[in-house]
Amino acid sequence: MAAITAALVKELRERTGEGMMDCKKALEKAGGDIEKAIDDMRASGAIKAAKKAGNVAAEGAIAVKTDGKAAVLLEVNSQTDFLALQDDFKNFVAESIEEAFAQKLTDAAPLIASRESAREALVAKCGENVNIRRLVRVEGDVVGAYLHGNKIGAVVVLKGGDVELAKNIAMHVAASNPEFLDASEISAEAIEREKNVFLQLNADKIAGKPENIVENMINGRITKFKAEASLKEQAFVMNPEVKVGELAKKAGAEIVSFTYFKVGEGIEKPVDNFAEEVAAQVAAAKQ
């Protein structure tokens, strides 16, 4: 049995939104296996679905630049959304993405190094910490990108088709955040877990039903799971009557890859305790 650490309880709480004690009990029951704990909580009806790991809010901006053959996605973080809306921060982000694209950088490390002086100057001026967090560069036959409000960015690489198609699929990715490119990428383990959760959640409904009926119900749930999780199987947001994979195929294109960035994924933002803050200010005033 894995140790039930505070960090593990905290992660489960962030992924499910449930209380600390409920998360601790679920982990103890699951022997410290966080994925099993999530499945058990779903099966018991405690939660409808687990949030993706690290889905914690933070501030900043996503930037994207493409020329139709390559694209760069960049995330720069700030402590507050107020700063993210200011021209000084926007200029820093714009200059950073331009440099990253021009230098054909494939990760954030060299950009962090070259932009350090500019970052320090921005921090000194605004009084907030600013960090270049991550960067991805993709190249291909056809590359399209979409940016939603500087908070979500997506790029799609196609073989065949055109930039407009790639951009439209990138828009879909930004809206739907698929987990997989194709249903074939979904592991047998993930499918088996989904099946077990379904059986536990619907134990009363399937009790006494013929085996073939139960099998059909399971297959229906797995088909829905695959459609929800894989890009090619999802209904296209601009025309739900067609799947994304079919859309690309009709245009003579093949979806090679996609990348999705959302500001703050995986970053824990401190939550201020207003009562403690007031108490601290009162205590300081008495000194």
Swiss-Prot record:
Species for this entry: Pseudomonas entomophila (strain L48)
Subcellular location: Cytoplasm
InterPro entries (alphabetical): EF-Ts_dimer_sf, Transl_elong_EFTs/EF1B, Transl_elong_EFTs/EF1B_dimer, Transl_elong_Ts_CS, UBA-like_sf
NCBIfam families: tsf
Sorted UniProt keywords: Cytoplasm, Elongation factor, Protein biosynthesis
Keyword Protein biosynthesis included in the entry's annotation: yes
Pfam families for this protein: EF_TS
Record-linked SUPFAM superfamilies: Elongation factor Ts (EF-Ts), dimerisation domain (SSF54713), UBA-like (SSF46934)
Involved in Mg(2+) ion dislocation from EF-Tu: annotated segments: 80-83
Keyword Protein biosynthesis: yes
Role summary: Associates with the EF-Tu.GDP complex and induces the exchange of GDP to GTP. It remains bound to the aminoacyl-tRNA.EF-Tu.GTP complex up to the GTP hydrolysis stage on the ribosome.
Gene Ontology cellular component list: cytoplasm
Similarity section: Belongs to the EF-Ts family.
Gene responsible for this protein: tsf
Main location: cytoplasm
Protein name: Elongation factor Ts
Listed GO MF terms: translation elongation factor activity
